[in-house]
Amino acid sequence: MTMTRLKISKTLLAVMLTSAVATGSAYAENNAQTTNESAGQKVDSSMNKVGNFMDDSAITAKVKAALVDHDNIKSTDISVKTDQKVVTLSGFVESQAQAEEAVKVAKGVEGVTSVSDKLHVRDAKEGSVKGYAGDTATTSEIKAKLLADDIVPSRHVKVETTDGVVQLSGTVDSQAQSDRAESIAKAVDGVKSVKNDLKTK
């Protein structure tokens, strides 16, 4: 009777140990699977973020290109940003019609889900005053640089600036002086082009 009980006890102990090992293995396996799934989700999330960033960058580039190609839109004053395929246009345009056209162009780009219009219409009078002030400053800077130059006889050179276009007139001693004056004018910030009407003696 005692031996029988002992055998039963050993059998129960063996069953309990086997069950515990199996349970532990199953727990470890489930835990490992959960960890792997979590890591996989993090990787997927990171990949999605990278993918979205790449998509947004591509959309921004396409919108900018589309605006540049449009003849009626001055794209240099328009800023383009894209976040999760939503494009935001900001900056200045010449008219409300131009702003509406810019939004229309952006909406037509592949991948764009919506467009946020934060464009401002520039005041024509304000732009004119700024343009005049800019031309005056450009003329003054060119005159100062010509005066400081040892080659160009600045007292004989007249400088006029209109919308960033500089006109040089007057008389110099040689073609070298004429070329030098033109080079100095072109190097000044804000100058779009130089019309050299200088005459040589």
UniProtKB/Swiss-Prot annotation:
NCBIfam families: PRK10568.1. This is Osmotically-inducible protein Y. GO terms for cellular component: outer membrane-bounded periplasmic space. GO terms for biological process: chaperone-mediated protein folding; hyperosmotic response. It comes from the Bacteria. The keyword Transferase does not apply. Induction: By elevated osmotic pressure in the growth medium. Residues 1-28 form the signal peptide. Residues 55-123, 134-201 form the BON domain. Keywords: Periplasm, Repeat, Signal. It is found in: Periplasm.
